[in-house]
Amino acid sequence: MAKTAADVLVESLIQWGVDTIFGIPGDGINGVMESLRTHQEQIRFIQVRHEESAALMACAWAKYTGKLGVCLATSGPGGIHLLNGLYDAKMDGASVLAITGMPFHDLTDTFTQQDVALDRLFMDVAVYSTRVMGPEHVENVAEIACRTAVAYHKVTHISFPTDIQDMKVSRKTASKRNVEGHTSLVHARSGQLPDESDLRRAAEILNTGNKIAILAGQGALHATAALLAVAEKLNAPIVKALLGKAAVPDDSPFTTGGIGLLGTKPSQDALETCDTLLMVGTSFPYIEFLPRTGKARAVQIDLDPIKIGLRYDVEVGLVGDSRRTLEALLPMLTNKQDRSFLDKAQKEMQVWQELLKKRFSNMDKPMKPQVIAHELGKRLRADTIVSCDSGTNTTWWARHIPAQRGQMFSCSGTLATMACGLPYTIAAQIAYPQRQCIAFVGDGGFTMLMGELATAVKYKLPIVIVIIKNDTLGQIKWEQMVFLGNPEFAVELQPIDFVKFAEACGATGIRIDDPKECGALLDRALAAAISGPVVIEAVVDPLEAPMPAKVTFDQATKFAESLLRGEPDRGKIVS
């Protein structure tokens, strides 16, 4: 029996190792849905409640597994809804393929129902976006879309007219140049190493440095051993960009933790005072936290040549896989005898840890968000995957939930979209059924895509969702005050009873509002997850500010201005 065009697409995905697709059915994509039904023993379809979630799940799938993430939506509004999640994938370098429906091929661009030229709409978010022109076209574009997404860690897109999906594929109607079997499914993984002369130039810079700091990002997640070996040889503290949180365990004596507004003071001091910087797999966007231009000699390792020199004036760019490049560089490095720079960073970390301890040990009510983050961090298994949403909760996640060896952590690092935490966690749990998967979210971000709790219940996922409930868009509130000097405005949220919401969806809900009971209730929640999703409503102090590691004079001035100009919580904040 002849295959349909949709069958060719689905079987191409299977051959590329795709076994999971996230999405929502619709009349514009039902031909592909029928093929997924007939192939469901080889590829599973995860039905979500909003297409944005499908794209975020595909992004998280790619991040956590290293495989191609795939999302699917119908024509028009379905495809449009994918965009936010796809931009998250684009900006964090995740390999994602989006498949969307279209109207009948001979009615496109005629103002018919759901007639949106998604192939053109997706041209910015996707490096390859195409429209299927006929059933014999599918095999070619599917191969290119999969290969491009995987090879370049980018987003690709195929838009599929609804009538062509059901058409039979026939070699008789193929063009003479579309020779059968001319495509290949072989994926040549990059084995790229920098030129040896560049490696030696990089080694010369690192060997002559006196105060060397390493900045590690997402591209170093698989290079932990090599990263630590280089740090030990150079006596260099390792500073971690947000997406590089798991690149080095936080109990390593070489790391000073994160950098930026969510980072640590020792990390900021290390970058401010270093004379040599080694950047590994990062395009950390907050340039103001890097060494002043001209202060440090720099070497950068990145798989993408476009990222070399993007954030800092590096002397040597090493294009290649971070682990293999570090391993090639290691024999060229000399053992540093002077430990003073590293020792200083380690002593500062001890002081920083004492400061954190003071904050997470505070038993006052309302409960401080640092308490729930710290107590959760103590209870995570060695195989835990923690996905964080965007907001003040990101600060507590970054500083108070330490990364242990074997754990995974991720968030929307560059787009910093709200609502990603729950979809990320669902994807992680589906990818790794035996691992503990936690969502650490704020009430603002959670409510944007809270319908996905029903998805977690439907698929009986043992996830735990920790909601930091402060009834406010906290990050925006403090940005208004500290960065602009304005009183808060339009940031209060209507309170929601998340325990009742969880129960209405068929999940377990647990409220924590007393810091003295926090640990025991967390134990109960984590144990209850064996039966399905658990929602923890952690009621916290809305006036606990996610302050930068080092407050600048301008920030302090702006904060004072906001109080003087009518900040409604001025009395409580001052007291």
Predicted features and spans:
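N-terminal alpha/beta PP-like core and its mobile active-site loop of ThDP/TPP-dependent enzymes
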Residues: M1-Q337, R379-A382, T455, P462-I467, ...
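Active-site diphosphate/adenylate-binding microenvironment
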Residues: L9-V10, I14, D27, V32-R37, ...
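Charged, low-complexity, helix-prone segments enriched in Lys/Glu/Asp/Gln
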Residues: W61, I80, S340-S361, A428, ...
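Thiamine diphosphate
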Residues: I99, L107-Q114, L261, G309-R311, ...
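Phosphate/pyrophosphate-binding active-site segments
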Residues: E136, K172, H182-L185, R189, ...
